[in-house]
Regions:
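N-proximal low-complexity "stem/linker" segments adjacent to membrane-targeting elements
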Residues: 1-17, 26
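Conserved N-terminal catalytic core of the sugar/cofactor nucleotidyltransferase
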Residues: 2-6, 28, 32-108, 119, ...
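A generic "binding-loop/recognition-motif" signal
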Residues: 11, 22, 57, 81, ...
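Active-site metal-binding loops of divalent metal-dependent hydrolases
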Residues: 11, 109-111
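Conserved beta-strand segments of alpha/beta enzyme cores
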Residues: 25, 74-76, 235-237
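Conserved beta-strand termini and adjacent loop/short-helix elements that scaffold enzyme active sites
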Residues: 55, 78-80, 133, 239-242
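Catalytic-core segments of class I nucleotidyltransferases/pyrophosphorylases
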Residues: 103-105, 112, 118-125, 137-138, ...
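A short, conserved acidic/glycine-rich loop-to-beta-strand motif
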Residues: 127-136, 141
């Protein structure tokens, strides 16, 4: 049974004043809530087990799901009403709700996209522990991958901060950033290593066998921190979609273009 987690617990501060009275998951685009759009789209690809985490105006989401007969059979709630746990902590808290034998598709509720989820499911084979959907687009923070698309680290191109469990990535003798070609060239002694820069989409596939590694993490943490601290001992890969189209509907101005985006994308 295909399963997914929809991150819907955020405060939605960039969508105020709408989110002063409702969770962002229930904000409508084209007359349909963001939560409904996400569930319905994934359901078209055969997903029938959903976990939705809630925090901000959590009861509204709980009631919304309970009022839909199909949702009430497919959707389980991971309640973070007492404390917002961020993406990693939210996934960790929900671990018991998933089938251990099937990857978990993770999707932010405020993202619209053109992903073929049958194709993306095929990218997560048994040997991968996680697959992150990435693209080449301008951003301030990039994930770093080797030529086999295995995760090596992270870089903030504004501050120059490097994060990685690999010392040769974190502490190179020199580093040359080529943003135009999405490369980071590192020198360690006489060895030159080229890493590839990709922007994370917020969509990823997660193997439940990674859950035990989360036990040493606090209750609250971002999922990217988990990936960056464990990628040297796990098999975390990036998957590039060249024609990827995403719209973050987390800001008021993005609502104005969302309907047009849906017309040409979904």
């Amino acid at each position: 049974m295909k399963q997914a987690m929809i991150f819907a617990a955020g405060l939605g501060t960039r969508l105020r004043p709408l989110t002063d009275t409702m969770p962002k998951a229930l904000v409508k685009v084209g007359g349909v809530t963001l939560l409904d759009r996400t569930i319905q789209r994934l359901h078209q690809y055969g997903y029938s087990r959903f976990v939705v985490n809630v925090h901000h105006f959590s009861q509204q989401i709980i009631d919304h799901i309970a009022q839909n007969d199909l949702y009430s059979r497919m959707v389980q709630i991971s309640d973070e009403s007492d404390e917002l746990l961020e993406t990693g902590g939210g996934l960790k808290k929900a671990a018991r709700l998933f089938d251990e034998g099937e990857p978990v598709l993770i999707h932010n509720v405020d993202i619209l996209d053109n992903v073929d989820y049958d194709w993306f499911r095929r990218q997560h084979l048994d040997e991968e522990d996680a697959v992150l959907l990435v693209s080449r687009r301008p951003t301030k923070r990039y994930l770093l991958f080797d030529n086999a698309m295995r995760l090596m680290g992270w870089v903030n191109i504004e501050t120059g901060e490097l994060r990685s469990p690999y010392d040769w990535v974190k502490n190179p003798d020199s580093a040359v950033l080529d943003v135009e070609n999405y490369h980071l060239n590192l020198m360690r002694g006489t060895t030159e290593i080229e890493l590839n820069l990709f922007a994370f989409s917020g969509i990823h596939s997660f193997s439940p066998r990674l859950f035990p590694l989360m036990n040493r993490f606090p209750d609250r943490f971002p999922i990217i921190d988990f990936y960056l601290q464990t990628c040297h001992r796990t098999r975390i890969y990036g998957c590039q979609k060249d024609d990827l189209r995403l719209l973050d509907v987390g800001k008021l101005d993005s609502l104005e273009v969302a309907e047009k985006f849906l017309t040409f994308t979904i």
